[in-house]
A protein has these predicted regions:
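Generic structural signal for small/hydrophobic residues in well-ordered secondary structure
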Residues: 16-17, 75, 96, 105, ...
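The conserved 3'-phosphoadenosine-5'-phosphosulfate
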Residues: 35-36, 154, 160-233, 239-248
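Generic structural signal for well-ordered alpha-helices
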Residues: 53-57, 93, 163-164
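Surface-exposed cleft-lining segments at the edges of enzyme active sites
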Residues: 77-85, 140-155, 206-221
Length: 248
């Protein structure tokens, strides 16, 4: 029996975390949490003692005594864990480091401009109070952007800072950064990172929310320019080619 889970799919929202969670859930050596997003480390009433950790294990994996079997790797997927504070600091990763400094992080990335619009569309579809996307872009890219869910849409695309925070706290050997193209064909990278055998996966249906309108060219151009320095930094830290995400 071990006392800590092994890995987290820590981000990013609207980058394929549902799909990756479902794919890994098919692996015989892996036990993924149910529900997918436990929101343990970002809870407002967070408590980081051993009793709370056992409750976390029971809630996520249905383990009666909170114990984790050594024969399996345990993982969960809460994209909010990589969320940034107003100064770019990690809001929740420090809690995770205290829980398990050896935990591994898998983080997915897609074009940050498309990711932002997808998140805004999801909030709107779910009936959350959200302003129009042009206002999100205008305010979210300003120097004093508020930290509400409407405006952290923009800061979630600060990929360079997100990677810097993870690397500083956990080191490169515990971080797997993936630019998503086709997850089914990228799973060997994930299994190699986790140290488990490769396998064939069954593709499961993933619902994509419809868009009522296309993103305006003005908003797109503003975000391309805004994210440019972050994408350069992201590429330098990860070795991932993000040239096509930069202002063009």
């Amino acid at each position: 029996v071990k006392k800590r889970i092994d890995f987290q799919i820590s981000g990013n929202q609207k980058c394929g975390t549902n799909a990756l969670h479902n794919l890994l859930d098919q692996h015989p050596a892996v036990r993924m949490s149910s529900p997918k997003e436990l929101h343990f480390f970002d809870a407002k009433n967070y408590c980081g003692d051993e009793s709370a950790f056992q409750t976390y294990h029971r809630d996520g994996w249905g383990l009666g005594n909170g114990g984790l079997e050594s024969a399996f790797l345990y993982g969960e997927s809460t994209p909010k864990y990589v969320l940034l504070g107003p100064g770019g600091e990690a809001r929740f990763l420090g809690r995770i480091q205290e829980y398990n400094p050896n935990i591994k992080h898998i983080v997915l990335f897609r074009d940050p401009v498309e990711r932002a619009y997808s998140q805004w569309n999801m909030l709107r579809h779910n009936g959350r109070p959200v302003v129009d996307f042009e206002t999100v872009v205008e305010v979210g890219t300003s120097a004093k952007s508020p930290q509400s869910s409407s405006f952290n849409i923009i800061s979630r695309g600060h990929y360079g800072q997100i990677c810097q925070n993870l690397l500083s706290l956990f080191g490169p050997e515990r971080c797997c950064f993936i630019r998503v193209t086709d997850l089914n064909h990228q799973m060997n990278e994930v299994t190699d990172f986790l140290g488990i055998a490769p396998m064939n996966y069954e593709t499961r249906y993933s619902y994509v929310l419809p868009y009522t309108s296309a993103m305006s060219e003005e908003a797109r151009k503003t975000l391309r320019s805004y994210y440019g320095p972050e994408m350069v930094r992201f590429g330098e830290l990860t070795g991932i080619d993000a040239a096509d995400w930069i202002d063009r």
